Amino acid sequence: MSVAGGSISTAAGNAGKNNALPMAQLADGWLELESDPGLFTLLLEDFGCHDVQVEEVYDLQKPIESPYGFIFLFRWIEERRARRKIVETTAEIFVKDEEAISSIFFAQQVVPNSCATHALLSVLLNCNENNLQLGETLGRLKAHTKGMSPENKGLAIGNTPELACAHNSHAMPQARRRLERTGAGVASCRFTGEAFHFVSFVPINGQLFELDGLKPYPMNHGCWEEHEDWTDKFRRVMAERLGIATGEQDIRFNLMAVVPDRRIAITHKLKMLRTNQAIVSGTLQKLLKADEQGERDEQQRPDTPTTLLEPSAFTARDLQSLLKNLDTEIAINEQHLADENDRRQMFKVDASRRTHNYDKFICTFLSMLAHQGVLGELVSQHLLPSKKIANRLNRQTNAATAAANAANTNVAGTNAAGSKSQQQQQQTQQQPQQTQTAKNGKSPGKTPGRRRKGRNKCRKRK
């Protein structure tokens, strides 16, 4: 605890000295952040770590180049079967040895709404310092918390104003209002019945660790095979975790990778390509000049100490083809670098839109419209199209119903007309027969025997 207090005084002293930290922003505590790779990338820059970026992972099977770690966002429900099943599964892999715990950076989340920063720090502060430049703030935090307990490390994170200010600067205005409604002591990712929570997966000393600030201990998933990368082990663990945590039904989760800044690798590759381009271009010019002058002496051949290419092994046509390929590669990488710069710029634009509070503008704009007497008319115009659309849909529905009824009526009329036509045809066929019977002196439809029998009965009655 004393070391954590020292971290506060050191950071606060630097803040007061430089007047760079708006301490009033910390009055409301830590605010809730969205799960967005652009937001996390800019947050790392604000922490002082400029050589890292965060990318969203859409396909677990797709290879990822040199990741420092992964951040998994999932729906946290305190009392559900899947949660109990995960606890039962992960309890067996808890690392409870105090010496092993103190040798890594594992911090318990004791500050509400700080799980996003916890997840990033769990990845960065467990990386090899030779491969990653942490910056002044994170480097000081790592040095101060060395050997601390997980709880004190969590307190040290919450008591570092640089981290808190950077964290809150990326929160939406709705997060502050939500915090005011729920109370400053309620954590959206810890104490509510259903929320979202971040955990980190990092390789430490040849083993895959899962660091969750809401768990009492770090979790060791074991070593990976000699012939595979640590990401292969992570994929297997993640596939199993998704099946348990989501019950193969809930798809509300997010996976992000903390990777080196792509612009650094592209810039390094461009530098190498341009160097090779200059070497090949110079060699080609000297070779063409030698061909023109007819000088083929070995001592006069171009000297290329920085290339492994022997000028005598290539013709001018070969060098021209190689130069063309280099030009193509340079153009492709320049486009990639421009895309990455545009992407980083869009992160900043989205951050400005996300964090800007539009409430005052909207209220002022509506007040001006009401003062000018046009607000009611605009509202009516906005509502009128909706009514027109509803009426149009009703008319279309009624027309479709009437058309269907008319079609059914036509079908019934057609069937009746067909039956009447058949009856007329039958009557037409019977008329010649009746005419022939009349010619023979017999009444159609009457039996002669019955007629005589009836006459005899009449005579008897008389």
Curated annotation (Swiss-Prot):
Any one Gene Ontology BP term: specification of segmental identity, abdomen
Comp. bias (Low complexity): 413-447
Record's keyword annotation contains DNA repair: no
Catalytic activity field: Thiol-dependent hydrolysis of ester, thioester, amide, peptide and isopeptide bonds formed by the C-terminal Gly of ubiquitin (a 76-residue protein attached to proteins as an intracellular targeting signal)
Domain UCH catalytic residues, every copy: 29-260
Protein name: Ubiquitin carboxyl-terminal hydrolase calypso
Active site (record annotation): C115, H197
Regions of compositional bias (Basic residues) in chain numbering: 448-462
Principal subcellular localisation of the protein: nucleus
Cross-referenced PANTHER family: UBIQUITIN CARBOXYL-TERMINAL HYDROLASE, UBIQUITIN CARBOXYL-TERMINAL HYDROLASE BAP1
Region (Disordered) location: 413-462
Subunit structure as annotated in this protein's UniProt entry: Catalytic component of the polycomb repressive deubiquitinase (PR-DUB) complex, at least composed of caly/calypso, Asx and sba (MBD5/6 homolog). The PR-DUB complex associates with nucleosomes to mediate deubiquitination of histone H2AK118ub1 substrates; the association requires the positively charged C-terminal tail of caly, probably due to direct binding of DNA. Interacts (via ULD domain) with Asx (via DEUBAD domain); the interaction produces a stable heterodimer with a composite binding site for ubiquitin.
Family of the protein in this entry: Belongs to the peptidase C12 family. BAP1 subfamily.
Location of the protein in the cell: Nucleus
UniProt-listed PROSITE patterns: UCH_DOMAIN (PS52048), ULD (PS52049)
